[in-house]
């Protein structure tokens, strides 16, 4: 019994759910149908009829009449056929939805959408075309009078200033006639109701008059350039060229007379372009001619600056070469003198020869350049380039010569410094011997004495090299450095030994107070004294220090610090 009840409840619940779903779908279908009905009403409300009435106010002939008939037919078809079909489809869709025939309702709605879409698009096209026609009429009416004023003013200006246009006047008159014909065609198109065609004519007038206005403004200026400004500048250029040649300038390389003839021909082609109203081509040619003319003027100016440079720099270079020549002769003599006393390296001798050779080359080049200037067969700009190069090489040669001269002076300076160094080393040895005598040492270790002897011999060898003629400073400096290292080492080692010996004496003196109390100590101190007398100061220090440290730890450090303070004070 319970199971049957459960089944009944499930079945009833399912039926209710299905019913609710169908009700929801139906409500949604109703909403879609209502939206389509609203769209249909919006289409009906579009002001096609009102716009068509506006067209009737125009000249109903020609193009306007033809378009009006087409739009009327389209509108009648939409109202009589397409929209009723859509309305019938929507009624069917509502009926099917109420009967829960949703598939049929959907199909009917799609048919309605198709018809409404077609109607909407066709109406939009009609309205756009209507608007284009009406706007064309309105714009034409608003703009044509302004264009007539522009044309009249242009015509008056050309007639009043026809002398400013020269041979181009005829072409301008022809173009004005072309624009005048457009006004006639505009009136005809408007009278025939061809408003769209009239619109095209208005736009053509705007473009044509704008172009013509630009030409009318540019032609006078271009004619002035071609007939007055540029010819005068070309004549001035030619006169300037001839005047400069009389003043001694060499200008054949510029070929200015030929350039002037070529540019004069170009001016004639520009005049032809202006006559034919090829304004862009004429303007480009004139700009090219101006650039070409400026370049030629710049080249003449370059020659003027070059001549001034040559006149100023020639004197400077001449003086520089004379100075270098005199200094080179002095340096050559100084080199011969130095070679008698010093041994020069091959590279140093070669440097002097190179300087002398370069000097002769520069003097020869300068001499040839002066001849060319006197013969007046070369442009000053070319002379300037050659003179600049000679001047730069003179400056370089000055530097090389100064360096070579400094090298010669340095050799003498090196000899003087070497002798000073030897005297310094001699003083170091004397000071070392004085310290030994003052310290009352019994003598120095054999190794130091041998090193001292070696240092003295090295110094003697340097003295010997300094007496040789020619003097080889490279060898002198090398052996001098070696001798100084030996003597300096001997001096430092001797000072260390003296300090070490003094410390040994102090340690032995300190240990003597314990000598009678400790036989081992006495023996060690005696041994230290023996080593001291045999100049074995390292061994003596080690012997005395070790025995005292055993007896009194730290005493050696204290005595060493005392000795250091005593020697530095």
Curated annotation (Swiss-Prot):
Residues 1-6 are extracellular. Residues 26-569 are cytoplasmic. It comes from the Bacteria. Keywords: Cell cycle, Cell division, Cell membrane, Coiled coil, Membrane, Septation, Transmembrane, Transmembrane helix. It is a single-pass membrane protein. One of its GO terms (cellular component) is plasma membrane. The chain crosses the membrane at residues 7-25. It holds the Pfam family EzrA. Belongs to the EzrA family. Negative regulator of FtsZ ring formation; modulates the frequency and position of FtsZ ring formation. Inhibits FtsZ ring formation at polar sites. Interacts either with FtsZ or with one of its binding partners to promote depolymerization. This is Septation ring formation regulator EzrA.
